[in-house]
Amino acid sequence: MQGSVTEFLKPRLVDIEQISSTHAKVILEPLERGFGHTLGNALRRILLSSMPGYAVTEVEIDGVLHEYSSKEGVQEDIIEVLLNLKGLAVKVQNKDNVFLTLSKSGIGPVVAADITHDGDVEIVNPDHVICHLTDENASINMRIRVQRGRGYVPASSRVHSLDEERPIGRLLVDACYSPVDRIAYNVQAARVEQRTDLDKLVIELETNGTIEPEEAIRRAATILAEQLDAFVDLRDVRQPEVKEEKPEFDPILLRPVDDLELTVRSANCLKAETIHYIGDLVQRTEVELLKTPNLGKKSLTEIKDVLVSRGLSLGMRLENWPPASIAED
């Protein structure tokens, strides 16, 4: 194996051991040391908590008002019936919400195969027992709601999201949407040529039958990759502050000296010196103005007082004066 010591080994799928239709082992190697646990733990958490699936969320049973009751002719109490309904493994095509019905009478077990549904729904475990009827005259009728979701959502967390006037007899069920029943991984030693410090990741996975183990791992890896995409293209996404453009010069500096309302004598003296704008005037010093013909100390005092009243003074320095708008004039 040639290459730079800084290059990471890229793992490959070595084997998929199909133990049953719902149980498989997936083996990947070689992994850099430590990456077996890094990837194995991340995939395990996603497979257990973040895989989408379908679960029973509500049930209505004829003659039953609440879950802490029993039904005549049914061996199990209602809480046990609800627990059994949680074990239904359902596949639904192109729908997020479906209703199923179950009607059964006579002695014997009531199983998932007794549920009536349309062509978009498949009961993966038809032999799953829901309850037992103990009398020839006994019967049970129920309406089952199945919804798509992710992870585990207890019934208590959905109470406030439902209509305030929830009909009496509508029983809420803790929803376990994840199609993964069990996931475990272990990291073994691997070797590539002279390197013996590598990892081999073995993932053992069992599902409820609504998804194949290999497909479950593929989806989990896709979820992980999508979450990491943001780090691949990491950059400052904060919007730059929009700063208000301040004018280069105080607007008063761009006004003509006539706006100062000086005496005619003072105004004429300034015009004779080609001082047309207040910005031109404030850059002159007292000494420079006193050299202006016919402009004496009285006129100078008048000019200084007018400028002070406007927050200005003589001898100011203005960078980049005159502005383009004045220079063009």
UniProtKB/Swiss-Prot annotation:
Give the gene symbol.
rpoA
Q: Using the UniProt annotation, give all residue ranges assigned to the region (Alpha C-terminal domain (alpha-CTD)).
A: 249-329
Domain comment quoted from the record: The N-terminal domain is essential for RNAP assembly and basal transcription, whereas the C-terminal domain is involved in interaction with transcriptional regulators and with upstream promoter elements.
Q: Name one GO cellular component term.
A: DNA-directed RNA polymerase complex
Alphabetic keyword roster? DNA-directed RNA polymerase, Nucleotidyltransferase, Transcription, Transferase
Region annotation (Alpha N-terminal domain (alpha-NTD)) ranges: 1-235
By its UniProt entry, which NCBIfam families does this protein fall under? PRK05182.1-2 (NF003513), PRK05182.2-5 (NF003519), rpoA (TIGR02027)
**Protein name (record):** DNA-directed RNA polymerase subunit alpha
Quaternary structure per UniProt? Homodimer. The RNAP catalytic core consists of 2 alpha, 1 beta, 1 beta' and 1 omega subunit. When a sigma factor is associated with the core the holoenzyme is formed, which can initiate transcription.
